[in-house]
Amino acid sequence: RLSLVGSEMCIRDRHKADSIHLDELPEDPQPIQADESFDDFIYNFASDDVLQRQRVKFPLPYYNGDKKANIEERNWKHDNLFTKQHYYTLLFDKEEDMDLVGDTSLTSVQVEWIFVKTRMMKKYYFERIKGAWILEAINLRPIERDENEDFVEFFGHFATDSLFQSQRVREPLAFVTTDPDDDFSVLETTLDLNQWFAFKPALPAERLSNINYGQRNDDGSPTKILALKGIGNGFSNILYFRRKAGEWELYKFEDVSI
């Protein structure tokens, strides 16, 4: 979970580290407290221009399909990633992979933008080098199509067309939410279609973000999980989809916002 309080402390810690290690070469940055968790790091990276420039390996390779360019530091524009939004999204093929979130042993993570209408993916490659996360490359490429109903294409339709959405929500829809009488337990129940439309979150239609901690995102997977995570506001919704007779359907909805 992205922690705003922790992030502010981390920014202060970074400035402290900067003053201690003035003799360090820029290409060998010192780790800060936020580097322990990639989620904490990426919030700091996107929020703090000074840190961002320290953590981009310039000249930065930028691949657009088969074309490669190098971005020099003087041409770098601060990238807010998803921090200007109220939430970001994560994609998984199976529930077990959600345990990778918060894993402090990771050394390679990719942040992805999936552009729904243009079917393009922009991927940022981060490596942890001597304890410090570094952006090493950016890659922009088309999303491949296959003969099955493509999840990104399906979700773009699902998010924007309520009639289509109503045809692709299983009834009854499994629903998991926080017990109002006990914050430490959850209620498992079901929703009908009208209740889904009353409880559902606003769905991202233009683009999806994803942080690839090492989970598989296989186009042929029969299941997909889309997690919507709030940035500093306790919002947490998870949508569970499966492919049935070749078509995607929403079969479970989880709202454990605090």
Indicate residue ranges for each PLM-predicted region.
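Single conserved hydrophobic/aromatic residue that forms the stacking wall/gate
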Residues: R1-I11
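Sec-dependent signal peptide cleavage junction
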Residues: R12-F58, Y62
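Coil residues (strongly favoring Ser/Thr
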Residues: D18-S19, N80, T104, S162
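Short, well-ordered alpha-helical segments enriched in acidic and aromatic residues
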Residues: D40-S47, L51-W76, F164-D179
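A structural feature that tracks compact, well-ordered secondary-structure segments
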Residues: F41, P59-P61, Y124-Y125, F154-H157, ...
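Surface-exposed, charged secondary-structure patches
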Residues: Y62-M120, D183-F235
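Short beta-strand edge/turn micro-motifs at domain boundaries
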Residues: V116-D146, G234-I258
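Surface-exposed beta-loop interaction hotspot
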Residues: K130-R168, P172-L187
